[in-house]
Design a protein with these regions (language model features):
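Soluble periplasmic/extracytoplasmic beta-strand elements of cell-envelope proteins
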Residues: 51-53, 60-64, 72-74, 90-92, ...
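Bacterial Sec signal peptide processing site at the extreme N-terminus
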Residues: 20-40
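Exported/periplasmic cell-wall-interacting domains
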Residues: 24-29, 79-86, 105-189
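Bacterial N-terminal signal peptides that target proteins for export
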Residues: 1-12
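Hydrophobic core
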Residues: 12, 16-21
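Solvent-exposed coil/turn segments that connect beta secondary-structure elements
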Residues: 57-59, 66-69, 78-80, 94-97, ...
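N-terminal post-signal-peptidase region of extra-cytosolic proteins
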Residues: 36-51, 56-57, 71-79, 84-89, ...
């Protein structure tokens, strides 16, 4: 009888231990979703000018310092009808906080978005308000409103913006910290 009780106690103890260990616990929820790695950064802070090269076909940006690659990132450039212009540019303005003067959304008094693609000229119904789109870590490259900034990358490898170059939110401040007014930016197909 004491052997049976000892075996039962051992089984119960093993079950308690097994379910308390994260690797052994039974998870009744859905499996975790795989997420894209949106960027990699390995800047050595060595000599050389930082340069940005953006490929509109792959929606990838590559960064170099001198002749060394220092990182890459997914971007989201202009969707159909709002294409990002190819060409060679230089950063002409840097602002940590900026809001779009051209795009935003409408939201009701509870903060629910009622129109996710509004402009300042959009008629605002009673009880709602226009919210200008935030563009943190803004780096202007044209005189007509195109720049790089933090934003949502909804589907890595696909366009999504109104013409700007969106960078992953976690990465935009990293790039912002190593660029300067005058940093070259090349955009190509």
């Amino acid at each position: 009888m004491s052997r049976l009780i000892s075996a039962l106690q051992l089984s119960i103890s093993a079950a308690i231990i097994a379910t308390s260990l994260p690797s052994c616990a039974v998870n009744s929820g859905p499996p975790p979703k795989a997420e894209h790695v949106l960027y990699e950064w390995y800047d050595d802070q060595g000599p050389g000018e930082v340069k940005v090269k953006i490929n509109l076909n792959t929606q990838l940006a590559h960064f170099t310092r001198g002749d060394r690659e220092i990182g890459w990132s997914y971007v989201a450039t202009g969707k159909e009808g709002h294409g990002t212009p190819s060409g060679t540019y230089r950063i002409t303005e840097k602002l940590e906080e900026k809001f779009s003067g051209s795009y935003g959304w409408l939201e009701d008094e509870f903060g629910n978005v009622t129109n996710g693609d509004a402009k300042p000229s959009t008629k605002v119904p009673p009880g709602q308000k226009y919210m200008a789109a935030p563009m943190p870590y803004w780096q202007r490259i044209t005189g007509y409103g195109i720049g790089m900034h933090a934003g949502v990358i909804p589907k890595p490898g696909e366009t999504a913006s109104h013409g700007c170059i969106r960078m992953p939110k976690e990465f935009a401040p990293v790039l912002f910290s190593v660029t300067k007014v005058g940093t070259p930016v090349t955009i190509e197909h």
